[in-house]
Curated annotation (Swiss-Prot):
FMN binds at residues 123-125, 281, 296-300, 324. Belongs to the chorismate synthase family. GO terms for biological process: amino acid biosynthetic process; aromatic amino acid family biosynthetic process; chorismate biosynthetic process. One of its GO terms (cellular component) is cytosol. It comes from Chlamydia trachomatis serovar A (strain ATCC VR-571B / DSM 19440 / HAR-13). This is Chorismate synthase. Coiled coil: none annotated. The keyword Methyltransferase does not apply. Reduced FMN (FMNH(2)). GO terms for molecular function: chorismate synthase activity; FMN binding. Pathway: Metabolic intermediate biosynthesis; chorismate biosynthesis; chorismate from D-erythrose 4-phosphate and phosphoenolpyruvate: step 7/7.
């Protein structure tokens, strides 16, 4: 397995959905950063299950700091964080151990390893992303110390979608964080879709934006900013697509329609538009970073689907009623996308400081 992400500022996540705990080890964090268990509460709450229109699994997701912090200051040594699994219910998975669950990683894991822990998805479960969000809290603290702000929000839910990238502001952050869906979309329309389709699930899109980034983040040629972001976002469970700036729509434009014109004023050189998404040649250029991540519908639904037992016998598979699943994983993925954005930017920020004497 490849459980590490990052170069200078790196994380290693561990644990399974129905194990006693999950966690993450962060290496490369500078010393002297203020950090306490309370710092993790807001971000963990945004990803936590058991809330409106998310999985009913009740996990407090309290973060315990095991190492790397003394007197609420990081020491520069590896930081180890632990999150206990408090609400594990494996009984519904016992009856599923002899069949393949459509859309789940079980078939792939068993084919690769010959054996797999399939309780709640095991290592492939989105439960693993709680560790990423915890690590992202530390990354965000570093970014804020450098006056870099980031935000992710739900920009698509089923057929509802907005492709606009708003300008990042304190009021926008507040609006997203106080929305039950972390979105700028009409909440009533999302609720109606959920009420009209109680046995089905929905896909979604999560957008991310930043304040203007410093020029120079990104390491050509294989460590380009968009390339690393694509890898980070596509590593999130259920992620199915990634774009930066105009993305796929740029393939339908002419060059004259796509190009961002350079302009200059008393503050310096900038772009008149931002269809490039904030990077040229894979390097940040002083513009806001803008991108989107597409998520598939949740695979666990109450409607029947054809499958087979492990001996090849055809069956009509239906998710057990006692199973606990999200109607749309993109809602809780908002916090995960923001965390992976923060982790990527901090790593590139530290790498960039090595490029010039």
């Amino acid at each position: 397995m490849h459980n590490q992400y990052g170069s200078i500022f790196s994380i290693t996540t561990w644990g399974e959905s129905h194990g006693p705990a999950i966690g993450v080890v962060i290496d490369g964090c500078p010393a002297g950063l203020s950090l306490s268990p309370e710092d993790f509460l807001p971000a963990m709450a945004r990803r936590r299950p058991g809330q409106l229109h998310t999985s009913p699994r009740q996990e407090p997701d309290l973060v315990t700091i095991l190492s790397g912090v003394y007197q609420n200051k990081t020491t520069g040594t590896p930081i180890s964080l632990l999150i206990e699994n408090k609400d594990v219910s494996s009984s519904s998975y016992e009856q599923l151990q002899h069949c393949y669950r459509p859309g789940h990683a079980q078939f792939a894991y068993e084919g690769k390893y010959g054996f797999a822990d399939n309780r709640g998805g095991g290592r492939a479960s989105a439960r693993e992303t709680a560790s990423r969000v915890a690590a992202g809290v530390i990354a965000k603290k570093i970014l804020l110390s450098q006056r870099i702000e980031t935000l992710a929000f739900l920009s698509g839910f089923g057929t509802l979608e907005s492709k606009n990238y708003p300008k990042l502001s304190d009021s926008l952050i507040q609006q997203v964080h106080t929305s039950p869906f972390y979105t700028l979309l009409p909440q009533e329309e999302i609720q109606n879709l959920l009420l009209l389709n109680p046995d089905d699930s929905f896909g979604g899109v999560v957008s991310f934006i930043t304040s203007p980034l410093p020029i120079g983040l990104g390491e050509p040629v294989f460590g380009k900013l968009p390339a690393l972001l694509a890898a980070a976002m596509m590593s999130i469970p259920a992620a199915k697509g990634f774009e930066i700036g105009a993305g796929f729509s740029s393939s339908q434009m002419t060059g004259s329609a796509y190009l961002d014109a350079f302009i200059a004023d008393e503050s310096g050189v900038s772009l008149q538009s931002n269809r490039c998404g904030g990077a040229l040649g894979g390097i940040s250029i002083g513009q806001p970073l803008e991108g989107r991540v597409a998520f598939k519908p949740t695979s666990s639904i109450k409607k029947p689907c054809s499958s087979v037992l492990k001996d090849g016998t055809p069956i009509a598979y239906r998710t057990p009623n006692q199973g606990r699943h999200d109607p749309c994983v993109a809602i809780r993925a908002v916090a995960v996308v923001e965390a992976m954005l923060d982790l990527t930017l901090v790593d590139l920020l530290l790498q960039h400081r090595c490029t010039q004497l």
